[in-house]
Amino acid sequence: MGNRETPDELAPTLWRTARALANEDRLRLLRIVADGGGTEPVSQVASVAGLPRPTASLYLRALNARGILGVERRDGRVFYTLKPDRSLPVAASVQDAFRALFRRGGPPVGWEERLVPGIRAFSHFRRLAMMEALLRSPGLDPEAWRGAVRIPPTSFAHHFAVLLRSGLLRRDGRGRCSVVRPSDPICGALFAALASIPDQPQTGPSMRSTRASVT
């Protein structure tokens, strides 16, 4: 009970969780762990993924650190399991989305590559602030949008490009931007986490959410 995240803690948890997921090899490892049911040691998981054991171990630890994977030690060996830390709402909702994805006969070939751009949209606190600003005020032109989030022009241009590649932005004929609701369950879980952050007093880059409609 006392370990559950507060709204103030949820935003950094969200972008750090997304950062851990925004990697094709890490997504592949997550699928392998799910398929193995926690019965395969790290060395076997690495072999199936075609990764060096130290690299696989590093990636698995990153997923465990964000609460997405559980870890068990048996007979001197390390096993990762599809048991999220339920005290971390983002990890739990993302894990539930992955379970649903894996139950549907398995994701299609190339699923990792297709998921990464959308996940990357949530993997930086400035991009969260930018999406949150559009949720509050849909249809902003880029200049008004940048002014709303107070991000330097060069940085704004970079994050704007990342969001465009993610497919989560829509621009009308006048260049005004709105957030597009994600269609895949993984990005949908991340989006729901962003939208669940209650309004907070603004003391820096805004992390508040809104009930404004999105497309």
What are these regions (language model features)?
Residues 2-14, 31, 35, 84-136, ...:
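Amphipathic alpha-helical dimerization/coiled-coil segments
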Residues 13-54, 74-86, 113-151, 178-186:
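N-terminal helix-turn-helix DNA-binding core of bacterial DNA-binding proteins
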Residues 46-47, 64-65, 147, 164-165:
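Alpha-helical residues within the helix-turn-helix
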Residues 60-61, 160-161:
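Short, hydrophobic-biased segments on the C-terminal half of alpha helices
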Residues 65-74, 78-81, 166-174:
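Beta-hairpin "wing" of winged helix-turn-helix
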Residues 164-172, 176-192, 199:
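Charge-rich, low-complexity terminal tails
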